[in-house]
Structures are given as C-alpha cells and as structure tokens.
A protein has these predicted regions:
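Extracytoplasmic
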Residues: 1-284
Length: 284
C-alpha cells in the first residue's frame, strides 16, 4: 500500500522569502517548503525546508517535527547549518573532506561545496512512530522516490563503517574514521541528535533516550528539571539541545559504557570534554 503520509509543496521560495531566511549567500540554490500531511489530520505533522541546485535532488535543510514522536528525520535547524557552513568556510581548505551523518553531509555539501563522504539519501536509521512500522516498505519506497536515486552499495557499506566507528571507543573509532578518510585533510561533523540516530543503529553499544522540556527565558530552569529526570531514571549523562525559543530536547545516555563511545566523547555531554579528546582535535 501507499505510505501513510505525503509531502505537499506549500511554497517555492522567491527572492524576498530567501532574504527573510538569510539565504542570499546561495543565489544558485532553489528553495521550497513542504508540509508532511496525513489523511484525517488537519495540521501538518512536520514541515521541511528543502533546497536543490539546478536539476539536482532535493535536500533537507530544516526539519520541524510537529509531533511528539520521532518522524523520518531527526530535527534539523537551518540556522545551525548556516553557522556551521560559515565555520567550515573559515576553518577548512577547499579540498578538505567532511565526515558526518548522511543528512548533515548532504546539506553541508550543498551549502559549502566541500566534498563529503556521503552524497546519497541513505535513509538510515529508519525513524518512524510505532503505528508506521508496518508500512516500512512503502515508506522506504516513497522516501527514495521523493529524495532521489537509491545509493550505491559501496556508499551504504561506507556509511555502516562510519556509524560503527562512532559507536566504538575513542581511539579505535578515530582510527576507523581516519581509514575511511584516507590521506585527506578531513573533519568530522557531529550533532547531538546523532546520538539518537546512532542509538537506533547500535543499541548494543549506545543506549539513548530523549525528552522535550519547555523553555522560558534561558536554559537554567530546564537544566534542573533535566538533572532531576536523569537521577530519577538512573541515566549516566545528558546533553541539551535548544529546538526553539520555547522548547529544548534533552538526550540521555543509559550507562557509562554509552558515554565511552567516540560519538559521546565528541559531543558536549555532561560527562564529556571534547576539547581534551586525544584521538581528535576540536576545531569548532
């Protein structure tokens, strides 16, 4: 059967709207906004800002999930990608290689022109609420049709190696990433939401949970909530990501072993010190 949702084009972005989003630096890109719609629900379940270059495949730059359930993509924020693109332009040479999760990689390749290890829409892990799990085959097919050609087998295998590297201890994981990058000048780009995605792929090495908290003013109020929640559930560490002015998402690690993974060591978790990581050097 069909997928339980559809992408509906709401708006092709004209020059004025592009200016409002602060995207004038990319005059060669075409921007559009899509709503993700389900039958019987009058509001969109998610909203995506999408860009493409010429006749290229569409690429997500912003994913705003309007439900409490994980849905297709982890939340992405255009503002974060823009500031990251500026940092990459400032700190890396034009022929540097970027290693990051496939969705981040595609967006950064589009915005920075740097080569990335992954260019295809890999769709891993499969992110869907429980009622959608039985539609997995039709969802995967619909996603492939919408986002472009299926990936080559070599890229799928390379991504599996990349995800595995992030789930290993810091030294072994960094060595595996170096092997993937070859002799190139290479930079690893990670986001706190990668914890959730990697946890779905490697549950045996990385136990992850998350909870959304309301924010009023600064993050100090929610942090005390988060610490209490962590203690009540016996989690080992946390990181907080601001989704909007009114909402923050706390990611929790289930145990100390999860905190020893390369990914956890590279992120600003309550138990990590990325600046002191011996296996890699923090740039931004």
């Amino acid at each position: 059967g069909p997928a339980p949702y559809q992408y509906q084009l709401v708006e092709d972005r004209g020059v004025e709207r592009v200016a409002a989003l602060g995207l004038e630096s990319w005059p060669d890109l075409k921007f559009a906004r899509y709503e993700i719609r389900m039958d019987g629900i009058d509001k969109p379940v998610a909203v995506a800002q999408v860009a493409r270059r010429g006749a290229g495949a569409p690429i997500v730059l912003d994913w705003d999930n309007r439900t409490g359930e994980p849905l297709l993509f982890a939340d992405m924020r255009l503002a974060e990608l823009k500031s990251l693109s500026q940092a990459i332009a400032k700190h890396t040479s034009n022929d540097a290689l970027l290693l990051g999760w496939w969705d981040t990689s595609r967006a950064l390749q589009l915005l920075t022109g740097r080569e990335t290890l992954f260019n295809a829409h890999l769709g891993e892990p499969f992110i869907a609420p429980p009622p959608w799990q039985r539609h997995r085959r039709s969802i995967v097919r619909y996603e492939r049709d919408f986002w472009g050609a299926p990936p080559a087998e070599v890229e799928v295998r390379r991504f599996q190696r990349f995800a595995e590297a992030l789930s290993l201890g810091a030294a072994a994981g960094a060595a595996q990433l170096r092997e993937l990058a070859g002799d190139r000048e290479a930079y690893v780009v990670v986001h706190v939401s990668d914890l959730y995605k990697l946890g779905l792929l490697h549950r045996e090495r990385l136990g992850v949970a998350y909870k959304d908290f309301p924010v009023r003013g600064d993050l100090h109020g929610p942090i005390s909530f988060v610490k209490r929640w962590m203690g009540d559930h016996h989690y080992a560490a946390y990181a907080v990501h601001e989704l909007s002015d009114s909402q923050a998402r706390a990611y929790f690690l289930a145990d100390a072993r999860s905190g020893n993974t390369l990914l956890a060591q590279m992120l600003p978790l309550s138990t990590s010190r990325p600046a002191e990581l011996q296996a890699q050097q923090l740039v931004h």
